[in-house]
């Protein structure tokens, strides 16, 4: 059996640990596969993007109106962000990622969707801690969003960092709601099914 090799496109030490972006060719599928690893854990793969795309599709489908301002928490491979841009109602897309290294991958156009993101004037990539942003009091002149789409942690209980825990509480979600327009939508990607009420 032939071994499938990979090319490491980037490797960085971050406050969250070692992060790497890898590319490999899958001979069985005939496609280039992009993967992100944090320490020894696979975070994402371009082979499995349906859930990230559906986060944007379903989240925006729940929003009425036009000229939508959208915030995406977590950039990663860019699948959620690019899917949001496909909705013609999106006026602006702000994508927040805590790791400048991840934003840098797109600025260096290392990923297949990087050109789509960067060449669209509606897109703004921001290096910031999404969870800290969600906790902040909203200044009077700060923007509100019609939709906030979050794909950062694996699940509300399997988090990339322990400091994210308070976001997944009633108080954390109330704080986030300050950043939404009235009637706005918050959508969350999780690797687990919804919990029983």
Predicted regions and their residues:
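Short, surface-exposed beta-strand-loop junctions and turns on beta-sheet-rich folds
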Residues: 27-28, 42-43, 140
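The AdoMet/dcAdoMet-binding core of the Class I SAM-like
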Residues: 49-189, 193-196
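N-terminal auxiliary segments of SAM/dcSAM-dependent transferases
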Residues: 1-34
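Class I SAM-dependent methyltransferase Rossmann-like catalytic core
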Residues: 17-19, 23-24, 36-67
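Short, basic/glycine-rich phosphate-binding loops at helix/coil junctions
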Residues: 30-39, 153-155
